[in-house]
């Protein structure tokens, strides 16, 4: 869950949903909070975290504490830690893997996650409507539980984002953004 942000919790199940089930490292904190919730239904929780950021491919991690921290400091794309970063630090975020395919990658059927999508990416309706019929701006994104920490089964596909666009101004037919960064950030 988020770090350095006050979160209201009204039940033990909501506590587990927002901050994860207890494990060997968190059970003593979780059980105190759960005990409080047996007698009341209005607990305010603030998660603390160390500054250790070690779950990266290149060794240069970035600690993003919560949505506000991301929006205020990183939403402009100034991170230099890679293409993707988990919304919250910890074991759950460390288990996430992101895989994507663009129209330019010719072997859609050979992509490990092609079965999660109806068809290969191509040119979006938005680009076509602008006369860019060969823009090939679409991509598919799969978010995977690589270690099985979230789902219990390694390599489980958790989320898919089909036919999102690489064009920053791309819109869906309902007028909402279809730009892949905005879609993933708002829906994941």
Residue ranges of predicted features:
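Surface-exposed assembly/interface segments
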Residues: 1-188
């Amino acid at each position: 869950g988020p770090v350095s942000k006050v979160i209201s919790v009204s039940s033990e199940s909501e506590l587990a949903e927002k901050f994860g089930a207890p494990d060997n490292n968190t059970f003593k904190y979780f059980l105190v909070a759960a005990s409080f919730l047996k007698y009341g239904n209005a607990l305010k929780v603030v998660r603390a975290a160390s500054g250790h950021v070690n779950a990266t491919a290149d060794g240069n991690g970035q600690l993003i504490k919560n949505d506000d921290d991301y929006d205020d400091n990183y939403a402009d794309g100034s991170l230099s830690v890679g293409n993707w970063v988990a919304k919250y630090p910890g074991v759950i975020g460390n288990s996430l893997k992101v895989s994507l395919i663009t129209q330019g990658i010719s072997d859609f059927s050979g992509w490990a996650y092609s079965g999660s999508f109806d068809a290969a990416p191509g040119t979006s309706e938005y680009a076509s409507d602008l006369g860019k019929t060969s823009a090939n701006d679409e991509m598919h994104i799969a978010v995977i539980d690589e270690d099985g920490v979230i789902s219990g089964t390694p390599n489980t596909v958790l989320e898919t984002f089909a036919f999102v666009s690489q064009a920053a101004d791309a819109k869906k037919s309902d007028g909402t953004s279809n730009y892949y960064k905005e879609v993933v950030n708002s829906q994941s």
